[in-house]
């Protein structure tokens, strides 16, 4: 388990001190894939580098496996870091070494015997799908394969935690998907805790169990990925989700809806469904029960952690009393009802 307590990080800049992280508190259970997302400059990379103390925090504690890394001696910290692997956006492979030898490098530096190195590296190359490329050099393999080498190298010391700092941001969408599938498989098969830093909500949606949203060095939202998508509270979260699932009407549609609302009454709603709710005729039943009119303005269906997720923007009109009853009924069916505006 990883526990970050009251963590702050300050750097001295040309115009004074800069607070990169402010009073961050996070708990990441063993075996979880935990995402940390935010825009550029939010403090994501600074935060992930405090987990293995590549960056020592100005204040606070970092517990990994029950040990406070900030209180360890230099020798103890080197030992603790063997339990924490890390992969980066840039692959950092040695061009003069083969795929096998790049993965073997940390074991060689640790003084592991050659026979044990082979017994460790070959299964790792098989795990990441590079057994046939073990004798090739970095210049002879693709970007996605280079990242797989980086993953295998990070796993060579048999860590309990894997930190991923924007590991897919330089890859094309298809390769990104393959790397994320690999990380999820490693998580399942090895029981590895993965902390994944990204600015892409698509990555969070596809692979993470829980997510923390970082803005200006502060955690502004945290929760299960499906819950955060269903009920985003902070404006930064809404904006990030909007990169994947549209949360707002297109401008031209907004203008038409505004004109229409001026002539009558209505409720502009965002409805979010998940799981079996996507397959059920809930809107049809609501219309029949409460004699409402639903005009669907915008809709999208996606998948989060293997579960169907749907989002609709609708204009609802009807008798005021029945409208309130209809909203209550929808919520009873597990639908998230968010009123975007009301015009009378």
Curated annotation (Swiss-Prot):
GO molecular function: ABC-type D-methionine transporter activity; ATP binding; ATP hydrolysis activity
Subcellular location: Cell inner membrane
Any Pfam family hit: ABC_tran
EC number: 7.4.2.11
Keyword 4Fe-4S: no
Gene Ontology CC: plasma membrane
Catalytic activity: L-methionine(out) + ATP + H2O = L-methionine(in) + ADP + phosphate + H(+); D-methionine(out) + ATP + H2O = D-methionine(in) + ADP + phosphate + H(+)
Binding site for ATP: 38-45
Domain annotation ABC transporter: ranges: 2-241
Cleaved signal peptide residues: none
Gene3D superfamilies documented for this protein: 3.30.70.260, P-loop containing nucleotide triphosphate hydrolases (3.40.50.300)
UniProt main location, coarse: membrane
Membrane topology, record value: Peripheral membrane protein
Source taxon at top rank: Bacteria
Keywords of the record: Amino-acid transport, ATP-binding, Cell inner membrane, Cell membrane, Membrane, Nucleotide-binding, Translocase, Transport
Function noted in UniProt: Part of the ABC transporter complex MetNIQ involved in methionine import. Responsible for energy coupling to the transport system.
Quaternary state and interactors: The complex is composed of two ATP-binding proteins (MetN), two transmembrane proteins (MetI) and a solute-binding protein (MetQ).
UniProt similarity note: Belongs to the ABC transporter superfamily. Methionine importer (TC 3.A.1.24) family.
Protein name per Swiss-Prot or TrEMBL: Methionine import ATP-binding protein MetN 1
Organism: Burkholderia mallei (strain ATCC 23344)
